[in-house]
Amino acid sequence: MATDADVIIEVILCIFLPPLAIWWHTKECDINVLIDIIFCLLFWLPGILYAVYICFFRK
């Protein structure tokens, strides 16, 4: 179970460093981190949206 501090850190990371937010949430460097890096290189907003999806909506 995530604490309030973890949720706040994830929100901040989702906005400023989306790939790091996914790594923080999953605790591993997997394909989701790579996909988010590609999204961030193409345009920042898709990277943010993908990070929010992985961190908060995907179980």
Swiss-Prot record:
A Gene Ontology BP annotation from the UniProt entry? innate immune response
The cellular location(s) given in this protein's UniProt record come to:
Membrane
Extract the Pfam families matched here.
Answer: Pmp3
Task: Tell whether Iron-sulfur is among the UniProt keywords.
Answer: no
For this UniProt record, the keywords arranged alphabetically read as follows: Membrane, Transmembrane, Transmembrane helix
Quote a single Gene Ontology cellular component term: membrane
The membrane topology noted for this protein in its Swiss-Prot or TrEMBL record is: Multi-pass membrane protein
Q: Which residues cross the membrane?
A: 5-25, 37-57
Instruction: Write out the similarity annotation.
Output: Belongs to the UPF0057 (PMP3) family.
- The identity of this protein, by name, is UPF0057 membrane protein txt-9
